[in-house]
Amino acid sequence: MRSKHKKFFYTLLFLFFSCLAFGQSTNYVPEDRVAADFTRLLDRPRVAFDGSFQSTKTDSVIIETGFIYSEKDEQVPMLIYKPVTGAKSFPVVIFLHGTGGSKDNEGIINILYQLTRRGIMGVAVDARYHGARIPGGAHASQEYAAAIIKSWSNKDPAHQKHPFFFDTVYDLWRVTDYLITRSDVQADRIGMGGISMGGIETWMAASVDKRIKVVVLDIAAQSFKWSLENNAWQGRVNTIKDAHLLAAKDMGDTAINQQNVKAFWGKLIPGITDEFDCPSMIRLISPRPLLILSTEKDQNCPLPGAKIAYASALESYNLKNAENKLKMDIAPNQPHRSTPEHQQMMLEWFSKWL
């Protein structure tokens, strides 16, 4: 018992000095309120899935392509890789691409295939304004940025859309709703992971959705608050630079700066530097297995912010005696990229805990 108390003390000490070093308070909004507020913010009318899928069988995998509806006019294109075995149902991992990517990227397809080799069904979807969600196919992140610009320009708060992360998070909840209706899915064994934007959408979606049992964040853990307050917002801003430039111009500025970035985030991803920031929301994932994969020189998700998020998670996991279910790995001297070593660790994490 004494060793357990000692371990908890050192955890709190680690949390305190991590946040102190990076200048961030640990006075987070209570977890239950975060979950309720985020769910309320994203809530919208439910519609029937009206799913349609086509199946192709090879020697090594069954591939399903199709879609479901998450909203009245929102098709969610899906790609499903299923093991070719005698099993009738499988654990599932939903895996998400980054900004400008799609479910059909070679790297995403390889992850789905590697999951099937471990007896896991792999599911990928196109985020809003990506991939097949644009007629004829998206042009990298061009349509995504255009949708964000349109949302920024909206003057009617009652009809404010949130294409920057939040709307895709809602889609992920509906994809999970759909998956648990399938007879070939083990509903109590669903995992979720993603790279960059997809990883951000993962910690947002999985934090409040307890049906997601295992989580992996690849170059996605961060603190928007820390980035904003420490002049480290440029990498994240540059992923949709045109949208930020327009917002800056609308506010009378000739260049993107801290204040117009704060206003931009405040309208399009409200709460992102407070209760919906990663260090706050990541606590809600405990005690479920969580793997955080970061890189030392990540300009989009700066490492100091990722360490603040990890420290926050560590406190929550220790309070629930689940510290063995939390792990962080940092790839040295690497920029904002998913490394082969981290992808292997991700696959092993899902195999171990799912």
Predicted regions and their residues:
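Primarily recognizes the serine-hydrolase "nucleophile elbow" in alpha/beta-hydrolase
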Residues: W173-D242, G271-T273
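Cap/lid segment of the alpha/beta-hydrolase catalytic domain
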Residues: T99-Y170, W226-N231
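Short beta-strand element of the alpha/beta-hydrolase
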Residues: M78, S89-G98
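Acidic catalytic loop of the alpha/beta-hydrolase fold
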Residues: K297-C301, P335-R337
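C-terminal catalytic histidine-bearing segment of alpha/beta-hydrolase fold enzymes
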Residues: A247, Y310-L354
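Short beta-strand/loop motif that positions the catalytic acidic residue
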Residues: I292-S294
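Mobile cap/lid helix-loop segments that gate and shape the active-site cleft of serine hydrolases
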Residues: V214-M281, P302, A306-Y310, N318-E323
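N-terminal cap/lid segment of alpha/beta-hydrolase-fold proteins
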Residues: D43-A87
